[in-house]
């Protein structure tokens, strides 16, 4: 069958993409973390399998999964813990991050946040910007690292990131990297953007994420999803 160039690329996209991986804060939500109704509708219109990957905690992502209404994987705490086929799987421990936060809270402005009570593999905190070099160095000395989601700072174990989560899903589904579309906006999304999957971001994304993206939407804070899905011909 003869295809024009445009039809060929539409065919490639629709046959390639078997999983859409979505960040939450700044990708589905606005600056105040209010979820975009347009984002919810876009996800509900999508026939491709959807997964959420976030620095937030598993109970929050589980609530989003239920109330948005999709049947897919959820990876919380930047890939540290997941709900896979109704089973909770934990890939890292919180002992190191928790001990580190307790220690640095004694001599820096670092303070834990409310959701730490539900964290099982990481810790989250706020701190003065001018102390971050000290905090970063101390984290590295303990085989930990700090990542900024744009909303809070996360203390993570070595190897714990969203790229780890995407690799897990690729293995579970037995698909290739080019079968995956990732969408995110900030520093803690960079690990999944570096895998060689298809990638897109909203207009509010960091400059680094924009540079790493195959497609940058002109729309922001969740309103980009319809645009991105149309670009990859996942919805019409």
Swiss-Prot record:
Active site positions: 23 (nucleophile)
Cofactor(s) this protein requires: Mg(2+)
Reactions the enzyme catalyzes: 2-phosphoglycolate + H2O = glycolate + phosphate
Keywords: Carbohydrate metabolism, Hydrolase, Magnesium, Metal-binding
Keyword Chloroplast assigned: no
MF (Gene Ontology): magnesium ion binding; phosphoglycolate phosphatase activity
Family, per entry: Belongs to the archaeal SPP-like hydrolase family.
Protein name: Phosphoglycolate phosphatase
Organism: Picrophilus torridus (strain ATCC 700027 / DSM 9790 / JCM 10055 / NBRC 100828 / KAW 2/3)
């Amino acid at each position: 069958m003869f295809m024009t160039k445009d039809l060929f690329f539409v065919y490639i996209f629709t046959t390639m993409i078997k999983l859409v991986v979505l960040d939450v804060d700044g990708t589905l939500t606005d600056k105040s973390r209010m979820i975009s109704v347009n984002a919810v509708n876009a996800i509900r219109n999508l026939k491709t399998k959807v997964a959420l990957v976030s620095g937030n905690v598993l109970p929050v992502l589980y609530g989003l999964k239920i109330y948005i209404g999709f049947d897919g994987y959820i990876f919380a705490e930047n890939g540290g813990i997941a709900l896979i086929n109704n089973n909770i799987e934990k890939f890292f421990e919180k002992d190191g991050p928790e001990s580190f936060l307790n220690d640095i809270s004694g001599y820096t402005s670092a303070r834990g946040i409310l959701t730490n009570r539900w964290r099982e593999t990481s810790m989250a905190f706020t701190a003065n910007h001018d102390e971050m070099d000290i905090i970063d160095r101390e984290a590295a000395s303990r085989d930990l690292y700090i990542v900024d989601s744009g909303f809070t700072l996360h203390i993570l174990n070595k190897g714990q990131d969203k790229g780890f989560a995407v690799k897990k899903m690729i293995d579970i589904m037995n698909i290739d990297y080019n079968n995956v579309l990732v969408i995110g906006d900030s520093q803690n999304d960079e690990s999944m953007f570096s895998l060689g999957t298809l990638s897109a971001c909203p207009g509010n994304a960091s400059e680094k994420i924009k540079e790493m993206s195959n497609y940058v939407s002109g729309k922001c804070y969740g309103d980009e999803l319809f645009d991105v899905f149309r670009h990859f011909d996942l919805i019409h």
